[in-house]
Amino acid sequence: MKFALTGGGTGGHLSIAKALAIELEKQGIEAIYLGSTYGQDKEWFENSPLFSERYFFNTQGVVNKSFFKKIGSLFLQAKAAFKAKEILKKHQITHTISVGGFSAGPASFASLLNKIPLYIHEQNAIKGSLNRYLSPKAKAVFSSYAFKDKGHHVLTSYPVQNAFFDFARTRTEIKHILFLGGSQGAKAINEFALLNAPKLTKQGIKITHICGPNSYEQVRFFYQELGLLDKIELFAFHNNITEVMHRADLCVSRAGASSVWELCANGLPTIFIPYPFASNNHQYYNVLEFEKENLCYVAPQNELLPKKLFEVIRKLNQKDDQGNKNLTAISNQLQQKIAKDGAKTIIETILSA
């Protein structure tokens, strides 16, 4: 038995691949990885000991490109698919798991050509174009969101790494706010943090701001101009995000699926600012169910004003009829919404098929 993991491009897809690879390693199952030279795949897995072999193809996405660029991208995908076909045959792969993203294309199609069972994990509430096409052909499609289109869909807990559960806690007071710009940085969140920082620090609320490497120098300059650089924690990125989340009582974040469920596992109440240009507006739909259940706050980017933060803080500090703060109730309910060992459940479901 030997698995191939494929897909990525961005941290959200790749974090799922990593969680699944860790689980395969725990069960003593060998795995290889097939991704792209474009995006973050090599950065994550080029030297990863989780895989016995790693392959990166010269491929790019097809969505949001001009007609001629789409043709070029499709040609690269097809060329890579035939290479992947030989690689899967060489390694005698018995199962392929796609975590989505454009870099999953070659190995997914190669698996179908080689008649290798293909399993898909769809991280978002709205499927990407590749997964929409492949779902009816896959052995199973795992997701934390309910889908009604064609395909064998299996509802599972999101494969969040156990550290997010281990560092979870119930929040009782807002003393520390985390502004999470993500690995790519988020201009809207960075500006929102800077606009609110003077009032927050004046009220004695601590700030941790992860602004992204491309924005670090500019954001640092503005904090310095505000005279706040020595009063806040500013990082381009952070290697121990679980520890950072653990210290925070409220978060401001984009709504990529991995971030949403990691914050959920940590029990950290969050104001989500969905990236408005995400394909099919999927970031908004990632948190729609949470919003309907009053488990988060959603602020559209085009309606984002500094006062929104303090409106949310006031609401979180309000108490219900039993005298419990909304902050505490939400924090508790978030921890109950997601179960541990999502990756283990997915792998065991595949092995028992």
Curated annotation (Swiss-Prot):
Belongs to the glycosyltransferase 28 family. MurG subfamily. UDP-N-acetyl-alpha-D-glucosamine binds at residues 10-12, 124, 183, 283. Keywords: Cell cycle, Cell division, Cell inner membrane, Cell membrane, Cell shape, Cell wall biogenesis/degradation, Glycosyltransferase, Membrane, Peptidoglycan synthesis, Transferase. This is UDP-N-acetylglucosamine--N-acetylmuramyl-(pentapeptide) pyrophosphoryl-undecaprenol N-acetylglucosamine transferase. It comes from the Bacteria. Cell wall formation. Catalyzes the transfer of a GlcNAc subunit on undecaprenyl-pyrophosphoryl-MurNAc-pentapeptide (lipid intermediate I) to form undecaprenyl-pyrophosphoryl-MurNAc-(pentapeptide)GlcNAc (lipid intermediate II). Pfam families: Glyco_tran_28_C, Glyco_transf_28. One of its GO terms (cellular component) is plasma membrane. HAMAP family: MurG. GO terms for biological process: carbohydrate metabolic process; cell division; cell wall organization; lipid glycosylation; peptidoglycan biosynthetic process; regulation of cell shape. It is found in: Cell inner membrane. GO terms for molecular function: UDP-N-acetyl-D-glucosamine:N-acetylmuramoyl-L-alanyl-D-glutamyl-meso-2,6-diaminopimelyl-D-alanyl-D-alanine-diphosphoundecaprenol 4-beta-N-acetylglucosaminlytransferase activity; undecaprenyldiphospho-muramoylpentapeptide beta-N-acetylglucosaminyltransferase activity. The keyword Ligase does not apply. InterPro entries: GlcNAc_MurG, Glyco_trans_28_C, GlycoTrans_28_N. Its EC number is 2.4.1.227. It is a peripheral membrane protein. Pathway: Cell wall biogenesis; peptidoglycan biosynthesis. It catalyses: di-trans,octa-cis-undecaprenyl diphospho-N-acetyl-alpha-D-muramoyl-L-alanyl-D-glutamyl-meso-2,6-diaminopimeloyl-D-alanyl-D-alanine + UDP-N-acetyl-alpha-D-glucosamine = di-trans,octa-cis-undecaprenyl diphospho-[N-acetyl-alpha-D-glucosaminyl-(1->4)]-N-acetyl-alpha-D-muramoyl-L-alanyl-D-glutamyl-meso-2,6-diaminopimeloyl-D-alanyl-D-alanine + UDP + H(+). Signal peptide: none annotated. The keyword Cell cycle applies.
